[in-house]
C-alpha cells in the first residue's frame, strides 16, 4: 500500500520535466504595436503578437501587462500573428506588455517587453514622404490675381475721388455765376437811381443866391439883363451823391444853363 504514493510522485516529476523540456523547444514570439508607442488619450491601439511559423497546433495566445494576464484569445489555424485591440485608452493603459502562447498544456517563453505610454496631447505623426508636386505655377497665378485686383481697386478709388471733386466744384461754381450775373444788374440799378436822385439833390444843394434868383419874378416894364452861365453837372452830382460809377458819370455828362436876372 505504501508504494502507490511513491509511484505517483515519480510520475508527476517525470511529467513536469517533460513539460519543461517541451516549453523550451517552442518557437520564439515577437510583439509590436501597429502605431507609435506614444498613444493619445481616448484613441485606440492594436498590439500584434507574431510567430516564427504557422501555429496550426497552437490553441491559445495571451497578452500580459507587467507579468499579469491582460487579454487572451484562441488562435486561428494557419496564421502567423494575432492582434489585440485596446481602447479607448487612458492613463491606466501605460505599462510593459508581452505575448505568450500555448500548445496543448505547454506555454512558450514570453516575448520581449513592449512599453506603451498614454499622453493627454494629440500626437502629430509625420506622414510618409510621397511624390512632391510642383506648386510654383499656383504661386505665380495667385500673385497675378492679387495684382489685377489691386489695380482695379485703385482705378475705382480714383474714379470716385474724381467724381467727388467734380461735384464739389459744380456746387461752388453756381453761387459765383449767380453773383456775376447779379453784379451788372446792380450796377445798372445804381446808375439809374443816381440819375433819378441827382435833380433833387442838386436843387437842394444850390447856393442861396441861386435859390433867390429862381424865386424872384421880374416886374413888367423893368429892364432885364440876362446872363447865362454854364454849370458842371458832374461836379455837382459827385458832391451830392459821393461815389458814382464811371458809367453813370459818362452818361450824365452834359451842360446845364441857368438864367440870372440882374436889375
Swiss-Prot record:
The chain crosses the membrane at residues 145-165. Coiled coil: none annotated. It is a single-pass type I membrane protein. Disulfide bonds join 49-99. Keywords: Cell membrane, Disulfide bond, Glycoprotein, Immunoglobulin domain, Membrane, Phosphoprotein, Receptor, Signal, Transmembrane, Transmembrane helix. The keyword Secreted does not apply. Phosphorylation at Tyr-228 and Tyr-257 activates it. May be phosphorylated by LCK. The keyword GTP-binding does not apply. Gene3D superfamilies: Immunoglobulins. Expressed in lymphoid organs and in cell lines of hemopoietic origin. This is Leukocyte-associated immunoglobulin-like receptor 1. The gene is Lair1.
Amino acid at each position: 500500500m505504501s508504494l502507490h504514493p511513491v509511484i505517483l510522485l515519480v510520475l508527476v516529476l517525470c511529467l513536469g520535466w517533460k513539460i519543461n523540456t517541451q516549453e523550451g523547444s517552442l518557437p520564439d514570439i515577437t510583439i509590436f504595436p501597429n502605431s507609435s508607442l506614444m498613444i493619445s488619450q481616448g484613441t485606440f491601439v492594436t498590439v500584434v503578437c507574431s510567430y516564427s511559423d504557422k501555429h496550426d497546433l497552437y490553441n491559445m495566445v495571451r497578452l500580459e501587462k507587467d507579468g499579469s494576464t491582460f487579454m487572451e484569445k484562441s488562435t486561428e489555424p494557419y496564421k502567423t500573428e494575432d492582434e489585440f485591440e485596446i481602447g479607448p485608452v487612458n492613463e491606466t493603459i501605460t505599462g510593459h506588455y508581452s505575448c505568450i502562447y500555448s500548445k496543448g498544456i505547454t506555454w512558450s517563453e514570453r516575448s520581449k517587453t513592449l512599453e506603451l505610454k498614454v499622453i493627454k496631447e494629440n500626437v502629430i505623426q509625420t506622414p510618409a514622404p510621397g511624390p512632391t508636386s510642383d506648386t510654383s505655377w499656383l504661386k505665380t497665378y495667385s500673385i497675378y490675381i492679387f495684382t489685377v485686383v489691386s489695380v482695379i481697386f485703385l482705378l475705382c478709388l480714383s474714379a470716385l475721388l474724381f467724381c467727388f471733386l467734380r461735384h464739389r466744384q459744380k456746387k461752388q461754381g453756381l453761387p459765383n455765376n449767380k453773383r456775376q450775373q447779379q453784379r451788372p444788374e446792380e450796377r445798372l440799378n445804381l446808375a439809374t437811381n443816381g440819375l433819378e436822385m441827382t435833380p433833387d439833390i442838386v436843387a437842394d444843394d444850390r447856393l442861396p443866391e441861386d435859390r433867390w434868383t429862381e424865386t424872384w419874378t421880374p416886374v413888367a416894364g423893368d429892364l432885364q439883363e440876362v446872363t447865362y452861365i454854364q454849370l458842371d453837372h458832374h461836379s455837382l452830382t459827385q458832391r451830392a451823391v459821393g461815389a458814382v460809377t464811371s458809367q453813370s458819370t459818362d452818361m450824365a455828362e452834359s451842360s446845364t444853363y441857368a438864367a440870372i436876372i440882374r436889375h
